[in-house]
C-alpha cells in the first residue's frame, strides 16, 4: 500500500502535468484560430481555380495537356503524405499514416510489390515512420509546419509534376487531414495528378471570349492549380492538427483533474487510517499502564 508521502508526490506530479496540458490547450487554441483563418481564406481561391479549369477544359482537347490526360495503365504511384511535426495531438498522425499505408498495401498492392510506390512526406511524424521501414521516399520535410510557407507547397508540386511529366509516376495522390470542425476531423485521399477538371453542364456554362486562347490559359493555369491545391491541403492539415491537439490536451486536463480527485480520496483515507492506528496504539498503551 502506498504511503502518505508516495501519494503526496504523485498528487504533485499530476498537478504539474495538468498545468502543462492546460497551457498547451490554450496555445493550441490560439494557433487554431490563426490556422483556421488561413485555411478558410484559401478555399475560395482554390475552388475558383478548379471551376475555371473545368470551364476551360470544356472548350479544348484535354488530351493535348499531359497533366489533364490520364494514363491508360497505372504502373507507378506517388503518395504525398501530410502529417504533423510533433505528437500530443491524439490520433491525428496515426490516422494519416494508416491511410497512406492503406493506399500502398490495399489499393496498390501489386504496384507496391514491384517497388512502384514512392512517397513524399510533409511532416516529421510521417517521414520518420516510413523512413525507418525503408520505403521509397523521394523527399521528406521536417519542421515544415513550424513556419508554414507557400514555397514548400510549390516545391512539392514541382517535384510531383516533374515526376509525372517524365513518366516516373502515373498517378499522384495526397493523404491528409481536412479541417471541418474541432470535433470532426476529416481524413481525405485525393488524386491530384492527372487532374480531373469538373466540366460544367450546358445549363451552368457561360459563353466567354478568351484572350489568349483557352489552351494557352490552361497551360498557365494547371501549375497554379496544382500549387494552390497542395497549399490548401497543407493549410487544412495545419488547422486540423491544432484542433486535434487542443482536443487531446483538453481531455488530458480533465483526466488529470479526475486522477487528482481519486488520489486526494486515497490520501485522506490513508491519513485517516494512520490517525486511527496511532489512536489505537495510544489507547492500548494507556490501558497497559492502568493494568
UniProtKB/Swiss-Prot annotation:
Compartment(s): Cell inner membrane
Transmembrane portions of the chain: none
Cysteines engaged in disulfide bonds, as pairs: none
Key words of the record: ATP synthesis, Cell inner membrane, Cell membrane, CF(1), Hydrogen ion transport, Ion transport, Membrane, Transport
GO cellular component: a single term: plasma membrane
GO molecular function: ATP binding; proton-transporting ATP synthase activity, rotational mechanism
GO process terms (BP): proton motive force-driven plasma membrane ATP synthesis
SUPFAM superfamilies assigned: ATP synthase (F1-ATPase), gamma subunit
PROSITE patterns: ATPASE_GAMMA (PS00153)
UniProt topology in membrane: Peripheral membrane protein
Domain of life: Bacteria
Pfam annotation, one family: ATP-synt
Family: Belongs to the ATPase gamma chain family.
Protein's job: Produces ATP from ADP in the presence of a proton gradient across the membrane. The gamma chain is believed to be important in regulating ATPase activity and the flow of protons through the CF(0) complex.
PANTHER family given in the database record: ATP SYNTHASE GAMMA CHAIN (PTHR11693), ATP SYNTHASE SUBUNIT GAMMA, MITOCHONDRIAL (PTHR11693:SF22)
Subunit structure: F-type ATPases have 2 components, CF(1) - the catalytic core - and CF(0) - the membrane proton channel. CF(1) has five subunits: alpha(3), beta(3), gamma(1), delta(1), epsilon(1). CF(0) has three main subunits: a, b and c.
UniProt protein name: ATP synthase gamma chain
Amino acid at each position: 500500500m502506498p504511503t502518505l508521502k508516495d501519494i503526496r508526490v504523485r498528487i504533485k506530479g499530476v498537478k504539474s502535468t495538468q498545468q502543462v496540458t492546460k497551457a498547451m490547450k490554450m496555445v493550441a487554441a490560439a494557433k487554431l484560430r490563426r490556422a483556421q483563418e488561413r485555411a478558410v481564406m484559401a478555399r475560395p481561391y482554390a475552388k475558383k481555380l478548379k471551376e475555371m479549369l473545368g470551364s476551360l477544359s470544356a472548350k479544348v482537347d484535354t488530351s493535348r495537356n499531359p497533366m489533364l490526360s490520364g494514363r491508360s495503365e497505372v504502373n507507378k504511384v506517388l503518395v504525398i503524405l501530410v502529417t504533423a511535426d510533433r505528437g500530443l495531438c491524439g490520433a491525428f498522425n496515426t490516422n494519416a499514416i494508416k491511410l497512406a499505408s492503406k493506399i500502398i498495401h490495399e489499393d496498390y498492392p501489386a504496384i507496391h510489390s514491384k517497388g512502384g510506390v514512392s512517397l513524399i512526406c510533409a511532416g516529421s511524424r510521417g517521414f520518420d515512420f516510413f523512413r525507418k521501414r525503408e520505403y521509397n521516399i523521394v523527399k521528406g520535410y521536417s519542421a515544415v509546419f513550424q513556419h508554414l510557407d507557400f514555397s514548400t507547397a510549390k516545391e512539392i508540386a514541382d517535384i510531383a509534376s516533374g515526376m509525372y511529366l517524365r513518366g516516373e509516376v502515373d498517378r499522384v495522390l495526397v493523404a491528409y487531414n481536412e479541417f471541418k470542425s474541432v470535433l470532426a476531423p476529416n481524413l481525405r485521399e485525393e488524386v491530384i495528378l492527372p487532374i480531373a477538371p469538373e466540366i460544367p453542364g450546358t445549363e451552368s456554362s457561360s459563353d466567354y471570349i478568351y484572350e489568349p486562347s483557352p489552351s494557352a490559359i490552361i497551360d498557365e493555369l494547371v501549375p497554379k492549380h496544382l500549387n494552390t491545391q497542395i497549399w490548401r491541403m497543407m493549410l487544412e492539415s495545419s488547422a486540423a492538427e491544432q484542433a486535434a491537439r487542443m482536443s487531446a490536451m483538453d481531455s488530458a486536463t480533465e483526466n488529470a483533474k479526475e486522477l487528482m480527485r481519486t488520489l486526494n480520496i486515497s490520501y485522506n483515507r490513508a491519513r485517516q487510517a494512520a490517525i486511527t492506528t496511532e489512536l489505537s496504539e495510544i489507547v492500548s498503551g494507556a490501558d497497559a499502564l492502568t493494568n
